[in-house]
A protein has these predicted regions:
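Short phosphate-coordinating micro-motif centered on Lys-Gly-acidic
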Residues: 1, 47, 86-88, 94-136
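Phosphate-binding P-loop
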Residues: 19-25
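The conserved Walker
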Residues: 34
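Mid-chain, well-packed structural core segment of small domains
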Residues: 66-96
């Protein structure tokens, strides 16, 4: 599936389209260069799902938890600062990835060997004209 976002005003529409295709998937690994828009797109998805919390990149916390109106939650990870895979084991990644909650992961390259087999790889590319292309 491919979604093209020509400008920031259309990001919520793109998030709605993405949500329509989530299905039974729960773990999403977001790939893209620094500044490609991973956090911005995840924020739009969370807002469209009804999250009212302040949504920020969990770069220093590693994981943020956002509550949904139905009582479920979303886990938003940023593994940019992970130095060793042992850190992911120490935080108990299995408790999150296999909880049944939605998990949105930034910088999954650093933890690929522990991602669930059914994790959805989402690639965000910044195009020359400033638009973004999302492939999954």
């Amino acid at each position: 599936m491919e979604i093209r976002i020509s400008n920031l005003e259309l990001i919520r529409e793109a998030a709605r389209e993405f949500i329509e295709h989530i299905g039974e998937h729960r773990v999403f690994a977001f790939y893209g260069e620094m500044g490609a828009g991973k956090t911005t797109f995840i924020k739009a998805i969370c807002e469209e799902l009804g999250v009212e919390d302040v949504i920020t990149s969990p770069t220093f916390a590693i994981v943020n938890e956002y509550g949904l109106p139905d009582g479920d939650c979303i886990y938003h990870f940023d593994f940019y600062r992970i130095k060793k895979l042992e850190e992911v084991y120490d935080m108990g990644f299995e408790d999150y990835f296999y909880s049944g909650a939605l998990c949105f992961i930034e910088w999954p390259e650093l933890i690929e060997e522990v991602l669930p087999e059914d994790a959805v790889k989402v690639n965000i590319t910044e195009n020359a004209d400033g638009s973004r292309t999302i492939n999954y």
